[in-house]
Every structure is written in structure tokens, then in C-alpha cells.
Design a protein with these regions (language model features):
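Long, compositionally biased intrinsically disordered regions
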Residues: 100, 106, 367-658
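Glycine-rich hexapeptide-repeat left-handed beta-helix
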Residues: 10-16, 24-47, 51-63, 72, ...
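Long, charge-dense tracts
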Residues: 84-85, 89-91, 95-96, 101-111, ...
Length: 658
């Protein structure tokens, strides 16, 4: 600063503890700096541009009514009306900060990295150390693989290394950030293009906003010990303590959460979360819903759904899992510990700790305090198909650098291996208790005879569908001249994929690959967060290659055909079965959808009118059945899949004629 500039600043009511420590950019002008106090090392950029605000008002960049202590201000910022002060921050360019109580960093901070979140078990023992690069899969392993202490120690070490590397006594506020009418911000790192409006308190965290996926923090929000990832919205009185919020999440309407992890595309409104592991697409909208000590993904919680992790004995020590795609109805209740199979529906109050992990696509219904299980029935539900279609469409992530690798497939080696086990379990129950039993018992749940018989059939249809799909995909677009060529094409490209598969919160992969990664972490070969995420990406991108290896092995088990000796006739047999399964399943889905257009569904329509008016009113609001887009999609699906199967059968017939 020149003597002249210092005099001009003093005349504009500016003060400094030591003017010698105030440095400015080349083209700095004192014109837009009023009522400002400087202490410590302060570095100012230029003030050339204006901000256009809602209502048509223009504000020139500059400093007005603010105290700065050890602050670097980028070019073209507007900072005014800071009630207390801004201390120890680097502020980017084109940032607008107005009417804020205080923004400071006190001592060295890790900005939320390394915070221990007591997920699943409230009393501890499954802590996940959150960090900027945390993926659902990494957190899954850290929370659940406690039987491998060496792995856990290594993963903590890797996170600590990252946290310490990014620790600092100076916070940063990015470029093009807007902070308005906000209370206290302490030890928070704020990324580019973030908008913070009317927020109450932010303490010890990172807001990883960027230009392609800005973060919005809204009115009345309170966050302590947190990390918020790109593209997320935390609004309207949400309260978070010790939480990780993944990419493109929406939390608002007074949602309160503690010790919880929310991964990509989660939504939480009105209700409460405590120690939950919310994998991708966990959605809860209702005031009366408590999710506690559970693991969820692709999950919809009905109003009044809750769980208990406390039996008034040794404290809140229990936990449970709803595998991917599970849903709860209104007023459902589960007493943990329990495990609910994938894509199942939970209805009523369940207190018997059942484990239906190997009976996916089921209904769990309570009658007189007894859990009744209807296996496989959700496979023909129109809701399940609608869910599978809506999730990819609702992926709100705009950041090209995705943290979670999400597999949306309804039928995958993960769910189909469970169907194989489920089918075997049901057949064994039938064998053990006799075919004429009215009710069978399984893991403290009851299964009615008719439900058991249908369950076996549903699972068989789904297995036909999956294996047939895999064969068709594998033989797609090639003109074969002989059975040898068919066999050569059917041979898997890799041995990886055989054996068990796992769903590590959204990512479906062979257990052998997950174990290989874990061994790599234990041995120190994989020793950075980005290397762990790269391994998950590799598993995800090779999914279809690994899937075929698994399906190839199952052909013999299910069809009794040795794949090494497979002929065109065998392929035709598999495809015929597949066509039957696909069309059969689509017909069931079609019939299920039809129920939504029955006379019972018209109850309450056509108020004050006759039956004709009721039907007309219904049609105006809901449309008619045949032109419903979903129904049309099902019919189209039947058509397309039949043609696909016929095309392969045609190619195979040419081979068998040779």
C-alpha cells in the first residue's frame, strides 16, 4: 500500500493493527473499501466487477463493514456486514459474502475428515472414519468386516494419512461462492459455486461443491462434524451431527440425523435417522419415520416405519439389514436384529428376528404377531419393475467424478444366487414337512403351502429369465457355422466371477474380487483412498464379463447341460424356456398393473355423480389402462423380447441344419 492509499483508506473509516502487513494486487483501488478493519496478514485482490442481485439491485464488489484477520481475498469479491469477523481464510474470486455473524478457523482443523461416525451400532464398534473421498463400498467394508482387524487398522491408517495431509490452520472459501444471512461458520472448508443462505451453524466440516455440481445449504440448517459431497442440497432446518452426505443427496424439512452415512441420491425429509448406513437411493419422506441402526439401499420407507435397536437390557446394541430394494409400508416395525432379503416388502410388526436373506423378492406380512413369508411374489409386482426403471432416471449426479459405483440390475448373480438357495430351501422344507402341510416354518417365519409352491415357481421363472438373458447377450450379433463356434463363444473370458457374489452397498461384484482388494489393503499394496476407489471402479466396469463366468457355470446346474458340449439345439431349448419366462412374467406384471384400474381403485372418484361420471373422472385424472405409458412399455417389452429370442433361435436353427 502507498502512503496515499493508506490515507484514503483511513478517511473511509478503515483501521489496521499494522498497515505494513496489508498487501494488495497491482490494480487495487481504495474506492470500494469502507469501514474495514485489518489485523494479521491480509492480502486483497482487485474490485472491478458488480454483482446483479434478485430484484434488480446491483452491488459493486468491495469490502464494507468487515473485520479481516489473516485473510486472503481474491479478485472481485463483495464482503459486507460481517457482525464479528472473518479469521484465517483464503477466499477465492467472484465470491459474495453478506450479513454473516462470524467465519473463522480456530487452530489446525481437518475440516470433518477423520471424524468417527458410530454407524449401525450406537455404542460403537463399527465406526466409519469419514473423508472427502468416502464411497459407499469403502464404508461398507469398514463398517462390516470387523472380523478382519488388520484390514480395519489399515483402512483407518489410510484415512488418517489423508486427513492429516489436508489439515490446515487456514480454511478456504472457493470461487463464485455465495454466503448470505448466515450465523456462525467455524472450521469449514467451502468449495466453488456453493450457496449458503440463511444457515444457522456450520462447524467442523467440508462442503465439496464445484462448478458442475454445486452444493446448496439452506435456511435453518445446523451441521456439526460433517462432510457434504458434490451436488447435494441440505435445506430447511435439517440438523446433522457426525454425518457424511454423498453426491446428489437431498435432506430437508427439519430432517434430523446423527452418526449416519448417506450415499448417492438419498433423500431424507421430516423424519429422523440415527446410526444408519443409507446406501444409494435410501428415501424417507415422512415425519413419523425413524430409521435407526440399519443398513439400507434402494429403499423406500413408509410413514411411521421404525425399528428398535434396544431391548432395555444392555443398551442400544442391535442392528439390522434391509438388503437392496426392500420397502416398508406405513406403520411397519422391525425389532432388530433381523435381515430382510433383497426387493422384499415389509408390512406390519415383526418381532421374531427373522433372516430372509436367501428368499429375495418376498412379502413379509404380520398376522397376530406372527411373521408370514410369501416368497418370490414381488417378482411379478408392477411396483418392482417400476422401481428398477426409475432409479437410473433419478440419478441426480452431475459431477463426472463419481464416488459410488451403482449397479441397477434387478437380476444379477447376487440376487439369482439367492434364488437358487431360496428354491432349494423351499424344496427342502416341502420334503421335510411333507407336501400336504398347511404351513411350513422357516427362521421364525411361517410360509403357507400355496405360497411355497408359487415361490418355487417364481424363482424358477426368474432363473430362466436371467440365464437366458445371459446366453442371448453372449451370442448376440454373430453368425455361427458350427456347434464348435458356439462353444468357443460361450467359453468365459476370465475365471473371475465364479462362486459367491456380494452387494457392497450398490456395487455388485464377485466375493473373490472383494477379498483380493481386502488382501491388498492388508498387505499394504493398496494404500491410498484413490487406489481403493479405482479397484471398485474396475470391478464395476468388468461386471458383465464376470457375470457371464458365473452364469456359464450355472447352466449345467440348472439345465443339466454341460456347457462344454453344448449344441445349437441346447441353445434353442434355453431360449424357448427364456421366452416362456419373460412373457409369463410380463403377463403377470400386466395383470398386476390392471388392478390399479379396477372398479375398487375408482372409489372416491366422480364425487357427487353417477357411475358413468366416476369412470369419466377417473379417466381424466389417471388415463385409461391401455394407453398408460407403463402398460404400453410392458406390452412393448413382450414384443421386443419375443423378437430377440426368435432371432437367436433362427440363427441356431441354421447351425443345426448344417
Amino acid at each position: 500500500l502507498t502512503e496515499d492509499e493508506i490515507l484514503r483508506l483511513k478517511s473511509q473509516s478503515c483501521l489496521a493493527d499494522d498497515w505494513g502487513k496489508v498487501t494488495v494486487a497491482e490494480e487495487f483501488s481504495t474506492e470500494f473499501v469502507h469501514h474495514t478493519r485489518f489485523s494479521g496478514e491480509v492480502c486483497l485482490g482487485v474490485f472491478h466487477s458488480e454483482f446483479m442481485l434478485p430484484g434488480g439491485i446491483r452491488k459493486h464488489s468491495g469490502l464494507r463493514h468487515v473485520t479481516l484477520h489473516n485473510v486472503t481475498v481474491g479478485d472481485n469479491c463483495c464482503i459486507e456486514n460481517i457482525q464479528n469477523y472473518i479469521a484465517n481464510y483464503e477466499i477465492g474470486h467472484d465470491t459474495f459474502i453478506e450479513n454473516v455473524d462470524i467465519i473463522l478457523v480456530d487452530g489446525v482443523s481437518k475440516f470433518g475428515n477423520g471424524v468417527e461416525v458410530s454407524v449401525l451400532n450406537e455404542t460403537g464398534g463399527r465406526e466409519v472414519l469419514i473423508n472427502d473421498k468416502l464411497s459407499a463400498h469403502q464404508a461398507y467394508i469398514l463398517a462390516l468386516y470387523r472380523h478382519r482387524p488388520e484390514l480395519i487398522a489399515r483402512m483407518k491408517e489410510i484415512t488418517d494419512f489423508y486427513s492429516n495431509k489436508h489439515a490446515s490452520a487456514v480454511g478456504s472459501i472457493g470461487n463464485h461462492v455465495m454466503i448470505l444471512n448466515t450465523g456462525s461458520i467455524k472450521n469449514v472448508r467451502i468449495g466453488d459455486y456453493c450457496r449458503i443462505c440463511g444457515t444457522c451453524r456450520l462447524y467442523n466440516g467440508s462442503i465439496n461443491s464445484n462448478e458442475v455440481a454445486p452444493v446448496h445449504i439452506g435456511h435453518g440448517v445446523i451441521c456439526d462434524d460433517f462432510i457434504i459431497s458434490t451436488g447435494s442440497h441440505v435445506d430447511d432446518g435439517a440438523m446433522l451431527s457426525r454425518c457424511f452426505v454423498g453426491q446428489a443427496c437431498k435432506l430437508g424439512h427439519n430432517y434430523s440425523a446423527s452418526d449416519s452415512l448417506f450415499f448417492s441420491n438419498c433423500q431424507g425429509e421430516n423424519g429422523e435417522a440415527c446410526a444408519i448406513f443409507a446406501g444409494p437411493y435410501t428415501v424417507t419422506h415422512h415425519k413419523s419415520t425413524l430409521l435407526i441402526a440399519g443398513m439400507f439401499s434402494f429403499m423406500n420407507a413408509g410413514s411411521g416405519s421404525n425399528q428398535s435397536n434396544h431391548m432395555y437390557k444392555l443398551g442400544p446394541i442391535h442392528q439390522g439389514t434391509l438388503e437392496r430394494g426392500a420397502k416398508t409400508t406405513s406403520d411397519s416395525y422391525i425389532l432388530w436384529p433381523a435381515r430382510v432379503g433383497a426387493f422384499s416388502l415389509v408390512m406390519g410388526r415383526h418381532v421374531n428376528h427373522s433372516d430372509t436373506s436367501n428368499l429375495p423378492f418376498s412379502y413379509l406380512i404380520e398376522q397376530n404377531n406372527t411373521t408370514y413369508l410369501v416368497p418370490g411374489v414381488n417378482l411379478r409386482s408392477v411396483g418392482t419393475i417400476r422401481d428398477a426403471q426409475k432409479w437410473p432416471k433419478r440419478d441426480g449426479r452431475t459431477d463426472p467424478n463419481k464416488l459410488d459405483y451403482i449397479n441397477y440390475n434387478l437380476l444379477s448373480p447376487y440376487t439369482v444366487q439367492k434364488m437358487f438357495k431360496g428354491r432349494e430351501t423351499l424344496q427342502n422344507l416341502r420334503h421335510a414337512s411333507g407336501e400336504l402341510s398347511d404351513i411350513y416354518s422357516f427362521h421364525s417365519a411361517k410360509i403357507r403351502n400355496s405360497a411355497l409352491v408359487k415361490g418355487i415357481r417364481f424363482y424358477e421363472i426368474a432363473i430362466h429369465k436371467f440365464l437366458g438373458n445371459s446366453v442371448i447377450k453372449r451370442l448376440e450379433g454373430i453368425d455361427f457355422r458350427s456347434n464348435e463356434e458356439i462353444r468357443a463363444r460361450l467359453k468365459p473370458d476370465t475365471a473371475i466371477g465364479s462362486g459367491e457374489w456380494g452387494d457392497i452397498s450398490g456395487l455388485i461384484a464377485p466375493k473373490s474380487e472383494i477379498d483380493a482388494l481386502i488382501d491388498g489393503i492388508e498387505s499394504g499394496k493398496v494404500n491410498r483412498l484413490k487406489s481403493i476407489n479405482a479397484e471398485f471402479e474396475k470391478m464395476h466396469s468388468n461386471y458383465y464379463t464376470y457375470e457371464w463366468t458365473w452364469a456359464y457355470e450355472k447352466l449345467e446346474e440348472f439345465y443339466g447341460i454341460r456347457p462344454e458340449g453344448m449344441t445349437a439345439e441346447d441353445v434353442i431349448h434355453i431360449v424357448e424356456k427364456w421366452k416362456e419366462a419373460v412373457v409369463g412374467l410380463d403377463r403377470m406384471v400386466y395383470e398386476d398393473a390392471k388392478k390399479e384400474f379396477s372398479l375398487a381403485s375408482m372409489t372416491g372418484f366422480g364425487a357427487d355423480g353417477s357411475r358413468l361420471e366416476k369412470e369419466l373422472d377417473f379417466e381424466q385424472v389417471r388415463g385409461d389402462f391401455e394407453s398408460n405409458p407403463f402398460v404400453m412399455a410392458v406390452l412393448k417389452h413382450i414384443e421386443v423380447k419375443t423378437a430377440l429370442g426368435d432371432e437367436l433361435i433362427g440363427r441356431m436353427q441354421r447351425v443345426s441344419e448344417n
